[in-house]
Each structure stands twice: as structure tokens, then as C-alpha cells.
């Protein structure tokens, strides 16, 4: 069995550094927590229903189209070395595939660091 958790910064407005934001910062005003929860659950239900109907390829395309910094070169720390890389996609195992000067790199969770 597995437990999956999702954390959302809803109405927080101040963050140390630039690594995080909140829905309130994006929208420009605070959100009602119950309404936010209802919209989030509705979105999950919609995607789950589509997955049950076999719409996995389209869901995956939508997911990839929203990846942060997709197809844009950005500095990363890979195996301790700072180097530019370009996010290509996420594979079927959840690994991030990056293009570097020396070739493609496959990285699992906590194996690379996105540098700001």
C-alpha cells in the first residue's frame, strides 16, 4: 500500500527565497479554503474519470505541456556538479529526463537540484 500527500500553499503570501508561491499570490487575492478544496477534488475526480476511460495518453500530454521550464535550458546540480540542462520529459517511472552537453541524464527524486 502507498500513501500520497499533496501540499498546496493557498493563502500564504510571504516566502523565504523564490522557491515557492501560493494560489493567493497567483490569483492576486485570498481564496476560500472550502472552495479551493472543492475545486481541487473536482479536478482530481475529472482526471481520475478520464484515466478510467483510458485517456492516459492525453492526460500525459497535458501533464508534459505544463512541466515547469520544459525545453528551456536552466542550471541544475547533477551529481554534485553545477551544469546547464534542459528538461525533456518525465518517463513512465516518474524520472526526469534532462539533456546536458554530455548527453541525456535520467534523474529520480532528490538526485538533482534545480538551481535558482
Spell out what each predicted region is.
Residues 1-116:
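Long, positively charged amphipathic alpha-helical accessory segments at protein N-termini or as interdomain linkers
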Amino acid at each position: 500500500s502507498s500513501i500520497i500527500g499533496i501540499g498546496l500553499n493557498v493563502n500564504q503570501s510571504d516566502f523565504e527565497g523564490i522557491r515557492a508561491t501560493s494560489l493567493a499570490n497567483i490569483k492576486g487575492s485570498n481564496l476560500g479554503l472550502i472552495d479551493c478544496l472543492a475545486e481541487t477534488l473536482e479536478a482530481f475526480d475529472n482526471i481520475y474519470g478520464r484515466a478510467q476511460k483510458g485517456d492516459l495518453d492525453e492526460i500525459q500530454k497535458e501533464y508534459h505541456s505544463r512541466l515547469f521550464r520544459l525545453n528551456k535550458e536552466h542550471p541544475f546540480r547533477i551529481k554534485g556538479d553545477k551544469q546547464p540542462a534542459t528538461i525533456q520529459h518525465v518517463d513512465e517511472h516518474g524520472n526526469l529526463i534532462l539533456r546536458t552537453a554530455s548527453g541525456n541524464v535520467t534523474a529520480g527524486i532528490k538526485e538533482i537540484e534545480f538551481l535558482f
